[in-house]
């Protein structure tokens, strides 16, 4: 995949070359999207809109730390949607990981989560965030146990992941109508990089075959159900819907 690769660390240790080789990235000086190594983290920038700033994954500080400490925990809609109850903490495959926010929330309340991400740039951002998270004295211990990244396409991986998870979580990219600053910023940068998930409808059936309990699909409240398969089971929040579908139980 072609993208502009930039190193702002001042180091000469070849880290950028290692990064490019690991994720299959090719430097393109004229690409409007840039993956930048800064002294703090790896970030994605839209070069023709510098005011949008950089997008990076941070499980330790910022909004994620605030959500972990002061958010709803088990009371969050995503936790309710996957079925967390009492001692039941399902094993989850997040097949459209993105920046890993929902996966992190589930891991922080005790679920083991395998994140799948097919875009190499997004996977590199996630890996960078995980590396810093794993090294953190506060959250590193449980984060290593519960949150894992697998760089694959969900369309093929969902048929051969083992062991089977109890829940598959899907949050495919869908054009946002909201004008909130964060959504606007992230979506503009993300849509420029990966575009909408035009093949997302193809995820529902393999997800239902893989999950032993349920599939949860996060949708904007104005979006039709994934693959136009309606379900009476949903958790509705302001702006979003978590559609719930039955999985395929394990056979003896």
Swiss-Prot record:
Pfam family, one: SAM_MT
Ribonucleoprotein in keyword set: no
InterPro entries recorded: 16SrRNA_methylTrfase_J, SAM-dependent_MTases_sf
Chief location bin: cytoplasm
Keywords: Cytoplasm, Methyltransferase, rRNA processing, S-adenosyl-L-methionine, Transferase
Single Gene Ontology MF annotation: rRNA (guanine-N2-)-methyltransferase activity
Top-level EC class as recorded in UniProt: transferase
Cellular component per GO, a single term: cytoplasm
Similarity field: Belongs to the methyltransferase superfamily. RsmJ family.
Binding site for S-adenosyl-L-methionine: 101-102, 117-118, 153-154, 171
Purpose: Specifically methylates the guanosine in position 1516 of 16S rRNA.
Protein name: Ribosomal RNA small subunit methyltransferase J
Location of this chain's protein in the cell: Cytoplasm
Enzyme Commission number: 2.1.1.242
Transferase found in the keyword field: yes
